[in-house]
């Protein structure tokens, strides 16, 4: 028997990837597409590549008969929309940032709004499947992690958990394709602005910073602060992070490989690459995999960690489906058994 799901925000890039994946999921039926601006429009007219013969509607969510609702909506939307009564009727996976951070003050600092639903904020489960699998299985509301966040945390988590690095030395240099900026028209994202170009943005201000710090702090069991700098790269999709940290001990690469293997050997979507094989965005394109590798610089006593994901799949829609699979006791990789399209 298939579960019935609905999607708010299916017109965006992440929403479209969600539709594409769910159409190929054997245990899901998409029965509702919500929109306030595209009511009556058939989804196939908006995205001819996606054969979903379903029109957008604008119904009261309390009227819907759904098992699960995905929210791929702008920040601050779901914080105002969701309530306990709705969560008694259906499960929710929120792809926005509205329930990712536990401290309400972080929303005032980083997102410039006062969170109106602090009780739900505390009850939401952070949907990084490789770290919080058991909590996700029991959750009614899952906060799907950010794209930079997913790549950064997964790449560094074992080092923080084992406390083998100087936490204050961590620097993350991240690069993302243009789809990470969303589908809305912006001058800075026009073809002539981004083609044959790479640029940094939001220095010391990127909103994924507190998210990364929060969950690496949980791993380290102490509050940490790190440096995160994102860049926009002239490609459609993909994230590559390069992270640097000072080692506290004289460790060899095999020592660190043993640590990563300890944490990730049983995870279906994390690929610890062989020595000397460095992650590339094309190897994870359109897939739910996170590729990770590292090198130890014996001269500087630093570990250099590389991670790559597809920002729209493992960084958004694919991870949301992975969360859904856990919440409904499906195989974790159901509907996600595809490799990179080189």
Swiss-Prot record:
Localization, UniProt: Cytoplasm
Gene3D superfamilies listed in its UniProt record: Dihydrodipicolinate Reductase, domain 2, NAD(P)-binding Rossmann-like Domain
Active site per the UniProt annotation: 147
Keywords recorded for this protein, A-Z: Amino-acid biosynthesis, Arginine biosynthesis, Cytoplasm, NADP, Oxidoreductase
Reactions it catalyzes: N-acetyl-L-glutamate 5-semialdehyde + phosphate + NADP(+) = N-acetyl-L-glutamyl 5-phosphate + NADPH + H(+)
One GO term of the biological process aspect: L-arginine biosynthetic process
An example Gene Ontology CC term for this record: cytoplasm
One GO MF term: N-acetyl-gamma-glutamyl-phosphate reductase activity
Pathway: Amino-acid biosynthesis; L-arginine biosynthesis; N(2)-acetyl-L-ornithine from L-glutamate: step 3/4
Enzyme nomenclature, EC number: 1.2.1.38
Family: Belongs to the NAGSA dehydrogenase family. Type 1 subfamily.
Protein role: Catalyzes the NADPH-dependent reduction of N-acetyl-5-glutamyl phosphate to yield N-acetyl-L-glutamate 5-semialdehyde.
Name of protein: N-acetyl-gamma-glutamyl-phosphate reductase
Species: Campylobacter jejuni subsp. jejuni serotype O:23/36 (strain 81-176)
């Amino acid at each position: 028997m298939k579960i019935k799901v609905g999607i708010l925000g299916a017109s965006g890039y992440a929403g479209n990837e969600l539709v594409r994946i769910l159409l190929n999921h054997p245990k899901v039926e998409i029965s509702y597409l919500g929109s306030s601006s595209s009511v009556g429009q058939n989804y196939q007219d908006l995205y001819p590549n996606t054969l979903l013969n379903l029109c957008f509607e604008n119904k009261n969510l309390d009227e819907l008969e759904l098992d699960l609702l995905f929210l791929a909506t702008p920040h601050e939307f779901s914080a105002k929309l969701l309530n306990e009564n709705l969560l008694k009727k259906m499960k929710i996976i929120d792809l926005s940032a509205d329930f990712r951070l536990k401290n309400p003050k972080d929303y005032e600092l980083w997102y410039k709004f006062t969170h109106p639903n602090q009780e739900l904020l505390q009850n939401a489960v952070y949907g990084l499947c490789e770290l919080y699998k058991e909590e996700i299985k029991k959750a009614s509301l899952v906060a799907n992690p950010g794209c930079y966040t997913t790549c950064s945390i997964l790449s560094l988590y074992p080092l923080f958990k084992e406390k083998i690095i100087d936490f204050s030395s961590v620097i993350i240099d991240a690069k993302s394709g243009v789809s990470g900026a969303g589908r809305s028209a912006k001058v800075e994202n026009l073809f002539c602005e981004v083609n044959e170009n790479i640029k940094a943005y939001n220095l010391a201000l990127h909103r994924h910073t507190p998210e990364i710090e929060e969950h690496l702090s949980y791993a380290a069991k102490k509050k940490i602060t790190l440096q995160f700098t994102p860049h926009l790269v002239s490609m459609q999709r993909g994230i590559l992070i390069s992270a640097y940290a000072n080692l506290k001990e004289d460790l060899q690469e095999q020592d660190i490989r043993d640590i990563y293997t300890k944490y990730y050997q049983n995870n279906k979507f994390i690929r610890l690459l062989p020595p000397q094989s460095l992650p590339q965005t094309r190897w994870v394109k359109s897939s739910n995999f996170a590729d990770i590798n590292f090198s130890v610089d014996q001269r500087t006593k630093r570990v250099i960690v590389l991670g790559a994901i597809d920002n729209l799949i493992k960084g958004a829609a694919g991870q949301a489906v992975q969360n859904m699979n856990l919440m409904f006791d499906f195989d974790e990789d159901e509907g996600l058994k595809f490799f990179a399209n080189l």
